Amino acid sequence: MAKGKDVRVTVILECTSCVRNSVDKVSRGISRYITQKNRHNTPNRLELKKFCPYCYKHTIHGEIKK
């Protein structure tokens, strides 16, 4: 039986370079991915290198709050 809160939690990953570029100029959008993480194995914020269709390259996507 599981104790306390659920171990697996759904998180949203957002492109960090799109967020920085949207401040300077008009952006076409911000790339976001939805995934799950195990709270016991990775208690800190998740950062993964994923493909951003707006930047046309692989960039770092960081976890954001819901």
From Swiss-Prot:
Transmembrane segments annotated in the record for this chain: none
InterPro entries associated with the record: Ribosomal_bL33, Ribosomal_bL33_CS, Ribosomal_bL33_sf, Ribosomal_zn-bd
Chief localization: plastid
UniProt GO BP: translation
GO terms, molecular function: structural constituent of ribosome
UniProt xrefs under Gene3D superfamilies: Ribosomal protein L33
Compartment(s) of residence: Plastid, Chloroplast
PROSITE patterns reported in the protein's UniProt record: RIBOSOMAL_L33
Keyword set, alphabetical order: Chloroplast, Plastid, Ribonucleoprotein, Ribosomal protein
GO cellular component: a single term: ribonucleoprotein complex
Family, as annotated: Belongs to the bacterial ribosomal protein bL33 family.
Entries under HAMAP family matching the protein: Ribosomal_bL33
NCBIfam families found in the cross-reference section: PRK00504.1 (NF001764), PRK00595.1 (NF001860), rpmG_bact (TIGR01023)
Protein name as annotated: Large ribosomal subunit protein bL33c
Organism listed in the record: Nicotiana tabacum (Common tobacco)
